Swiss-Prot record:
Species annotation: Shewanella sediminis (strain HAW-EB3)
EC number annotated for this UniProt entry: 6.1.1.22
Alphabetized NCBIfam families for the sequence: asnS (TIGR00457), PRK03932.1 (NF003037)
Encoding gene (name): asnS
Reactions mediated catalytically: tRNA(Asn) + L-asparagine + ATP = L-asparaginyl-tRNA(Asn) + AMP + diphosphate + H(+)
Localization: Cytoplasm
Protein name as it appears in the record: Asparagine--tRNA ligase
Length: 466
């Protein structure tokens, strides 16, 4: 496709004097008394718009160019020249401007104002990509997702597309969205008066997936190194800045790997992604550092250069209890660490990313490998300065008898997990993996604190518009 991007002009891919055509939207128009207009046109390929210097000698100057407002779409052709102004190296001496689309009423155009609160923009999810902040988030999100695929490809992993509709609860928490084609006004009932799901589309109770992990484990048991990258769903009625009902997860699974192996993999992956975004999206990161969080670039560079610390959960609890800091949530062995505990460990105690390992079994999922002490499981969380938990993982329970005992402990049906149990009956192997909440990663990189602002169309309680 031979469409010229604004980014390619700024990268110097066209020699001075070249004729180029850019296509995009007007960010602003400024007119001078000398009969020249300056159009700032962006196409989303980079943070900055390109400036077009438009002479009044153009045929449509008075009828169209002087009527252009923010949001109008244009096709602008001109000669690449050095820019005498600050902020960009090149601009266009324009020879033609074709208006592709007008803004119907500039006075009511929601994006006309120079600044909107980020909360207000959530009500305009269809238009908010046109703003500086959401456009920058989208480019960073793209850069990170491409880096993740590159990393796993270079490491010899195979990408597996796991199903979005499932009959299994990978977390055992029960917070799942039901998928059904039954008539809600006339539900079929069995002899016990319960809904008869045998008459439903799938012939049994089905849900949107909370994780692709269990399915990925089956492929790791044949292909050794696999990963999933796709949407997951949680029907958790939490209306907070850290929760979404629909979000994306990255979940690698590795056969013959133990917990330390995947802790190392997590460190490699995060550093690879952060290096990529620092290199590819410096313009957007500089915007975030200026307008959102001044520490974003320093934080990423520090992360990349830091060695990860490691600590057992039991030792972490002792560190927290003896640190002298008063926490909102008291610390004792057996609790699930809260964000304030995680951030203290990463930001104040270790002053580096930290892997917390070997959690109490009672606060973790059934599939995590039981340690020899019978009280803890081979689970880990990766904690990052500035956000807390960013990755959760575990060595999986490969012993059928222990897995069955855990299912029984948690009142889960062995029959529901018959296929998962089969993997322990036919050539079982030690294997491990982790899950990375992709939106949490984007939030960490951009400094945008509300997770609803780092996904294009957020889904949350009472919020499913667009």
């Amino acid at each position: 496709m031979s469409i010229t991007s604004v980014a390619s002009v700024f990268k110097g891919e066209f020699a001075i004097g070249s004729q180029v055509t850019v296509r995009g939207w007007v960010r602003s128009r400024r007119d001078s008394k000398a009969g020249i207009s300056f159009l700032a046109v962006y196409d989303g390929s980079c943070f900055d718009p390109i400036q077009g210097v438009v002479p009044n000698s153009l045929e449509n100057y008075n009828d169209e160019i002087l009527k252009l407002t923010a949001g109008c779409s244009v096709v602008m052709t001109g000669e690449v020249v050095d820019s005498p102004g600050k902020g960009q190296a090149f601009e266009l001496q324009v020879s033609s401007v074709e208006v592709a689309g007008w803004v119907e009423d500039p006075d009511t155009y929601p994006m006309a104002a120079k600044r909107h609160s980020i909360e207000h923009l959530r009500e305009l999810a269809h238009l908010r990509p046109r703003t500086n902040i959401i456009g920058a988030v989208a480019r960073v999100r793209n850069s990170l997702s491409q880096a993740i695929h590159r990393f796993y490809h270079e490491q010899g992993f195979i990408w597996v597309s796991t199903p979005l509709i499932t009959a299994s609860d990978a977390e055992g928490a029960g917070e799942m969205f039901r998928v059904s084609t039954l008539d809600m006004e006339n539900l079929p009932r069995n002899d016990e008066g319960k809904v008869d799901y045998s008459e439903d589309f799938f012939g049994k109770e089905s849900f949107l997936t909370v994780s692709g992990q269990l399915n990925a484990e089956t492929y790791a048991s044949a292909l050794s190194k696999v990963y999933t990258f796709g949407p997951t769903f949680r029907a958790e009625n939490s209306n907070t800045s850290r929760h979404l009902a629909e979000f994306w997860m990255v979940e690698p699974e590795v056969a013959f790997a133990d917990l330390d192996d995947v802790a190392g993999l997590a460190e490699q992956m995060l550093k690879f992604c952060f290096k990529a975004v620092l290199e590819e999206r410096r313009d957007d990161l500089e915007f975030f550092a200026q307008r959102v969080d001044k520490t974003v670039i320093d934080r990423l560079e520090s992360f990349v250069s830091s060695d990860f610390a490691q600590v057992d959960y039991t030792d972490a609890v002792e560190i927290l209890k003896s640190c002298g800091k008063k926490f909102e949530y008291p610390v004792e062995w057996g609790i699930d660490l809260q964000s304030e505990h995680e951030r203290y460990l990463a930001e104040e105690h270790f002053k580096a990313p930290v892997v917390v390992k070997n959690y109490p079994k009672d606060i973790k999922a059934f599939y995590m490998r039981l340690n020899d002490d019978g009280k803890t499981v081979a689970a880990m969380d990766v904690l990052a300065p500035g956000i807390g938990e960013i990755i959760g993982g575990a060595q999986r329970e490969e012993r059928l008898d222990v897995l069955d005992a855990r299912l029984e402990e948690m009142n889960l049906s062995k029959e529901d997990y018959w296929w998962y149990r089969d993997m322990r009956r036919y050539g079982t192997v030690p294997h491990s993996g982790f899950g990375l909440g992709f939106e949490r990663l984007v939030s960490y990189v951009t400094g945008v604190s509300n997770i609803r602002d780092v996904i294009p169309f957020p889904r949350a309680p009472k919020s499913a518009s667009f």
